[in-house]
């Protein structure tokens, strides 16, 4: 099950499981994998995959990876992530594409995927339309992919931000991340650059 209206201009979002189920997510992975293979002209492109803090995001990610792997993609899973961290990983690990399982600021109950192929760029409307066509019409390629976990990438991302952003004058930062994924990252990073941090939630 996959609702066509979930394909938006720059990313994809659905209510889960009302508008998309795990089989639908796997088909999205097949569609994205097929698209990446077409655009990179590689049989086994490397794709960075991450997920946000929602309780069901890991099962969504597992289904997405299953679809990607079935097309021949090599997955590099960086685990719990922020969207900018996934884009950073594409440069840091020199991969071919990214797929971030998140519904951004949408409330709980939503899921989605932010995607990009060219470094520093997310899918544009024409790429989303192409992905929609491939996915809904099952125009999938088949291949033999693989996956590996990049277990320490949170630390790599935090250290990069901290080392580039030291402050001279100590300031007090009140951090309210609204129970979002940023709560795993922001306090540590702000302390690392020299702030006194007060965490609210």
What name fits each language-model region?
Residues 1-66, 70-71, 147-171:
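An N-terminal, well-structured beta->alpha segment
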Residues 10, 51, 101, 175-178, ...:
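Active-site flanking residues adjacent to catalytic metal/cofactor-binding acidic residues
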Residues 14, 75, 97, 142, ...:
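Residue-level detector of short coil/turn "hinge" positions at structural boundaries
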Residues 25, 57-61, 109, 124-125, ...:
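Alpha-helix N-cap/helix-start motif
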Residues 41-119:
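Ferredoxin-reductase
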Residues 111-201:
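Gly/Ser/Thr-enriched, mixed-charge loops and adjacent short helices
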């Amino acid at each position: 099950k996959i609702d066509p209206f979930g394909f938006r201009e720059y990313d994809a979002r659905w209510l889960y499981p009302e508008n998309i189920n795990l089989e639908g997510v796997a088909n999205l992975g097949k569609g994205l994998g097929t698209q990446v293979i077409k655009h990179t002209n590689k049989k086994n492109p490397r794709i960075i995959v991450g997920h946000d803090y929602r309780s069901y995001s890991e099962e969504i990610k597992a289904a997405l990876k299953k679809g990607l792997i079935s097309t021949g993609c090599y997955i590099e899973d960086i685990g719990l992530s922020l969207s900018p961290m996934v884009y950073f990983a594409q440069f840091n690990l020199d991969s071919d594409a990214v797929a971030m399982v998140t519904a951004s600021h949408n409330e709980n109950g939503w899921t989605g995927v932010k995607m990009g192929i060219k470094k520093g760029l997310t899918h544009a409307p024409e790429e989303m339309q192409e992905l929609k066509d491939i996915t809904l019409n099952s125009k999938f390629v088949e291949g033999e992919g693989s996956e590996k976990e990049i277990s320490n990438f949170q630390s790599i991302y935090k250290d990069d931000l901290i080392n580039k952003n030291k402050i001279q004058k100590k300031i007090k930062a009140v951090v309210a991340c609204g129970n979002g994924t940023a709560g795993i990252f922001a306090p540590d990073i702000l302390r690392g650059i020299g702030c006194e941090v007060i965490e609210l939630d």
